[in-house]
């Protein structure tokens, strides 16, 4: 070992010595040798990096190209790969099974041919022969309960049910139409009356001594007269009639071109400048007609709880109610509330600037005091009038409009006239 090591060291020393001896002989080659090393190293590095770059770029390009191709063709490639794999595995296994190396092993083991799997299971107990034909699924399920037949039966039953429902609905609609045709337009004018506007049913009883106005007359600025007695008549030439009282028949003319009558036991009718019919009366056949061509200022509600006959459409935004015998009135051009009880009540607003209001107190015998104020082109407010009657009391107040009227006991009538005058 020592000799070998010594020989190797001697050889290396000799080569180094020869190199150094070469450069000692040609010392001018040392700088050139350094230059050569630098050039070779640079060229080698460029070549090396070039190969590396080409390799990397080639792989990158291959990846960039192959990835979208794989994505595009994957629906075909993947099943094809799977099928190829399965097929190759199957064929390979078949070849392996058919290889001559398998049979010698069996023959060497000495397994006789009679106990091979294909011969062990007798034909009689194979699954195909064990299950009899009668209990196979195709024979167990009867034809009547197959899904297709069940669906048909369900559709038939649904169709029958729908036809029955339609027949019942038609019968009901026929019955309703017959009832409605039979029940239209019937009204009774005694204590109990029917209102076509579905204002409700009610009964009212007037006490004796409806109202007695003090005798008097007033002349309006345009020649209208207002006389009030047991049965009063108010007539002014303002384009319509408005009458109200204990047992009155008459009315006064409104600027809306209509006639309005209401009272304890009146027969009369009036036309308002609004759409609908209004009939009111204590225990009367008749009443007032609210027949009009136009509409009141806004939509509203008309209710009569006494024993009125008929009904009307009030386009106003207020409420018209009567709790006692009857009530007739309307609201023109604005909203508000008009209520009356006892015998009768009528009120309205005229197209003129002034206002004609009345305020009265009624005692048990029906004596009345009337007081009214009239102003030109001004808006006044009706104050609340209270009365006592043998049957009922009522209040009337304004809601959202500057007009209104209230009556109790006998009657109170409010109207707005465009002309000057007094009403006593």
UniProtKB/Swiss-Prot annotation:
Biological process (GO) annotations held by this record are: post-embryonic development; reproductive structure development
Compositionally skewed regions (Basic and acidic residues) per UniProt: 167-220, 288-304
Cited function: Many of the major pollen coat proteins are derived from endoproteolytic cleavage of oleosin-like proteins.
* Superkingdom assignment: Eukaryota
**Listed GO CC annotations:** membrane; monolayer-surrounded lipid storage body
Annotated TM spans: 16-36, 38-58, 69-89
List UniProt keywords, sorted A-Z: Lipid droplet, Membrane, Repeat, Transmembrane, Transmembrane helix
Give the organism the record lists.
Brassica napus
Tissue expr: The full-length protein is found in the tapetal lipid bodies of immature anthers, the proteolytically cleaved C-terminal product is found on the coats of pollen grains. No expression is detected in other flower organs, siliques or seedlings.
Stretch list, region 6 X 18 AA tandem repeats of [KR]-H-[EG]-[SG]-G-G-[SA]-[PSA]-M-G-G-G-K-H-[GE]-S-[GV]-G: 241-354
- In residue numbers, the region (Disordered) covers 164-424
Give the protein name, as stated in the record: Oleosin-B3
PROSITE patterns linked to this entry: OLEOSINS
Region of interest (Hydrophobic), residue spans: 38-119
Q: Where is the composition biased (Low complexity)?
A: 391-416
Compartments where found: Lipid droplet; Membrane
Locate the region Polar.
1-37
Q: Name the residue ranges with Gly residues bias.
A: 242-255, 341-355
Provide the residue span(s) of the region labelled 4 X 5 AA tandem repeats of S-S-D-G-S: 396-415
| Start and end residues of each stretch annotated as 4 X 10 AA tandem repeats of I-P-[EV]-S-I-K-P-S-N-[IV] | 111-150
Tell me yes or no: is Ribosomal protein among this UniProt entry's keywords. Answer: no
């Amino acid at each position: 070992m020592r000799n070998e090591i010594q020989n190797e060291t001697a050889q290396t020393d000799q080569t180094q010595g020869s190199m150094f001896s070469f450069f000692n002989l040609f010392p001018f080659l040392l700088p050139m040798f350094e230059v050569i090393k630098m050039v070779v190293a640079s060229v080698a590095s460029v070549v090396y990096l070039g190969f590396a770059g080409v390799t990397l770029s080639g792989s990158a390009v291959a990846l960039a190209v192959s990835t979208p191709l794989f994505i595009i063709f994957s629906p075909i490639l993947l099943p094809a790969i799977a099928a190829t794999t399965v097929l190759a595995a199957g064929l390979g296994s078949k070849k392996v099974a058919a290889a001559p190396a398998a049979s010698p092993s069996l023959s060497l083991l000495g397994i006789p041919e009679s106990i091979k799997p294909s011969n062990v299971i007798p034909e009689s107990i194979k699954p195909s022969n064990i299950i009899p034909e009668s209990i196979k699924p195709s024979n167990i399920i009867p034809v009547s309960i197959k899904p297709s037949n069940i669906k048909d039966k369900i559709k038939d039953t649904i169709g029958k049910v729908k036809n029955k429902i339609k027949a019942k609905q038609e019968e009901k609609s026929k019955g309703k139409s017959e009832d409605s045709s039979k029940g239209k337009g019937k009204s009774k004018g005694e204590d109990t009356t029917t209102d076509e506007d579905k204002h409700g049913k009610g009964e009212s009883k007037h006490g004796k001594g409806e109202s007695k106005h003090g005798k008097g007359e007033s002349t309006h600025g345009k020649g209208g007269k207002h006389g009030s007695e047991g049965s009063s008549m108010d007539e002014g030439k303002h384009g319509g009639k408005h009458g109200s009282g204990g047992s009155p028949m008459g009315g006064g003319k409104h600027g809306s071109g209509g006639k309005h009558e209401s009272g304890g036991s009146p027969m009369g009718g009036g036309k308002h400048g609004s759409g609908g019919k209004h009939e009111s009366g204590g225990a009367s056949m008749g009443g007032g007609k609210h027949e009009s061509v136009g509409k009141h200022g806004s939509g509203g509600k008309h209710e009569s709880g006494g024993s009125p006959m008929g009904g009307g459409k009030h386009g106003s935004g207020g409420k018209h109610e009567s709790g006692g015998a009857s009530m007739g009135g309307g609201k023109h051009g604005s909203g508000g509330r008009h209520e009356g009880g006892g015998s009768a009540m009528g009120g309205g607003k005229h197209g003129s600037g002034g206002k004609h209001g009345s305020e009265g107190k009624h005692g048990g015998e029906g004596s009345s005091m009337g007081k009214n104020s009239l102003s030109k082109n001004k808006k006044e407010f009706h104050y609340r009038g209270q009365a006592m009657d043998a049957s009922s009391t009522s209040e009337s107040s304004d809601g959202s409009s500057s007009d209104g009227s209230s009556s109790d006991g006998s009657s109170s009538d409010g109207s707005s006239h465009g002309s000057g005058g007094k009403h006593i």
